[in-house]
Amino acid sequence: MIAPGMHRFLLMERVVHGRPAAAALAEEVDRLERRRVLVVTNRSVANSALLAGFAASLGERYAGCFSGVTAHSPRRCVIEGAEAARAANADLLVAIGGGSVIDAAKVMQLCLRHDIRDPAGLSDYSGRGRGDPSTRPADADRWIRIVAIPTTLSAAEFTWFGGASDPERGVKEPFTHPMMIPQVVIMDPAMTAETPMPLLLTTGMKAVDHAAERLAALNANPYNDAVSSLALRLLSSGLRAAHRAPADMGARGDLQYGAFMSMCGSWSGIAVGLGHAIGHALGAHCAVPHGETSCTLLPSVMRWNADANGARQALIAGALGAREGDAGTALADLINELGLPTRLRDVGVSRDAFPAIAHKALGDVLTRNNPRPVRSTGDIEEILEMAW
């Protein structure tokens, strides 16, 4: 029997895939009738030949570039980006980059809509869900939208929320609004060509984490199972192929589509669980990049949950190409094959940090979604020991 639920169709219009990004962007800007396009990116993209290609394709519609985005999209850089958009009189933001760039552009939208001009002003909007992500709000016409062109596999472009860090307090906070999902996503595998291979592989494992935790969920539905299973097949085969042959654009295209599908289960109401919750805490407390948190945590989380969802985990193992139904081993084998870190100690995490990490993770809302109930920080420390 299929459990009751709801599938939400978000305020995203198009996902363009497999076409040259510069030409596709020019066509989308024409369709959207935008005249002042600000590119939001980081210094590495801004200093590459990519930016010149986009500027040429946009012609007089190119209003400039904000290249000040840094890791974890600090509040200050978001405020500076919003000021650049105001100065350019921008009517469209084009985010070219990975998760930090796309998150920064989303929070810039919020700053522009509510005239936030100081980092402290963001506090009034953090951590709050603002509206149903499938419902167009009354003020929709007052939002400047985003076209996202990803260069990694973080899949930030497929959500209606973004994060910005506050270095003074040592936290990264979520900001949420239905209009923060990009209006258009353009997936061009060539846009990943300059991405360092370790970053491509670890963000690919983050996408594996998205799909695996959704496929492991006890409240899963047929839509979620279909998209999450295929996401794992595309991602596992694509990661192996890209690792063997970095110039294989077909593999990179499969990876982009797999990252897209890894997020689709969320649209049918299926959330991720404890792996993501501990990953959030690990990133905040120990500054471990999210892709590396997935590599070091996910196999242990699956093993800890195995008694609660063994049948679901067999689906994961099969989608990863394993002959046996042990998802933890199948994931560990994939991570080892890719030459990525497999243990928390490999990424500089000390056992001394476990109590603080466990405390943060226990308070994360995603912990409630875990197939096996998490009753104490001791449960989480047990997983951390398994992963260390």
Residue ranges and their predicted role:
Residues 51-54, 82, 101-115, 159-160:
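Short Gly/Thr/Asp-enriched flexible loops that form oxyanion-binding sites at enzyme active sites
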Residues 90-106, 151-156, 285-288:
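Glycine/serine-rich anion-binding loops at beta->alpha junctions
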Residues 14, 36-38, 64, 91-94, ...:
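Structural motif
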Residues 13, 27, 114-222, 315:
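A glycine/threonine-rich phosphate-anchoring loop and its flanking beta-alpha core
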Residues 18, 39, 74, 99, ...:
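Buried hydrophobic positions in well-ordered alpha/beta secondary-structure cores of metabolic enzymes
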Residues 214-330:
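Active-site segments that bind and position negatively charged phosphate/pyrophosphate groups
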Residues 1-92, 344, 378:
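ATP/NTP phosphate-donor binding region
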Residues 313, 317-388:
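C-terminal charged capping/lid subdomain of soluble metabolic enzymes
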